Amino acid sequence: MIIAIDGPAASGKGTLGKRLAAHYGFRHLDTGVIYRAVAKAMLDLGADLQDEARAVAVARALDPEKFGDPVLKTQAIGDAASVVSAIPAVREALINFQRQFAADPPGAVLDGRDIGTVICPDADVKIFVVADPKVRAHRRTLEARGRGEAADEALVLADILKRDERDKNRAAAPLKCAADAHVLDNSNLDIEGGVRAAIAIIEQARATR
């Protein structure tokens, strides 16, 4: 079973993906981490983030063991990843990695921005997570401060709005809700509420298969 979760930055899709994977005993892949890993490798090399050839080479040589590096969660890496992920050739280079992950039994939960539309268009369940930008900025600010980072909520909001615009309008796999996706607005839901709502969606889908 493949569960695809998409949504904009800081919408809560990553946390939801982890919880759903644990609930069902499936593997979980935060596909945003893949692009963050490419971005970090590019920065470590001192390379131009828009250097397509270098970025593709880095993408093809990714080491999954490094996906847990806490540095990947920082705002700076997130901003860099937004640039790298807009390169069509980079996205193409990473498609097979994601599809192979999704195909491994007994099931997988993948979260990102193009899972239900590009990576796994035939996913058994598709959930598109949304939340008010101000709510997302507040959550992201609290996360950053929890890691000991200085974070200005107004600047975080501005960055989120900028990333939304970039993600929606990029030429390669723009952020959009699949026609057969279930929209989950968690603006007024805590983590537990969001998980319960998602499980209800999944169980309903399983019952009608």
Curated annotation (Swiss-Prot):
ATP binds at residues 7-15. One of its GO terms (biological process) is pyrimidine nucleotide metabolic process. Belongs to the cytidylate kinase family. Type 1 subfamily. InterPro entries: Cytidylate_kin, Cytidylate_kinase_dom, P-loop_NTPase. The keyword NADP does not apply. It is found in: Cytoplasm. Gene3D superfamilies: P-loop containing nucleotide triphosphate hydrolases (3.40.50.300). The gene is cmk. GO terms for molecular function: ATP binding; CMP kinase activity; dCMP kinase activity. The keyword Transmembrane helix does not apply. This is Cytidylate kinase. Its EC number is 2.7.4.25. One of its GO terms (cellular component) is cytoplasm. It catalyses: CMP + ATP = CDP + ADP; dCMP + ATP = dCDP + ADP. Its main location: cytoplasm. It is an enzyme of class 2 (transferase). Keywords: ATP-binding, Cytoplasm, Kinase, Nucleotide-binding, Transferase.
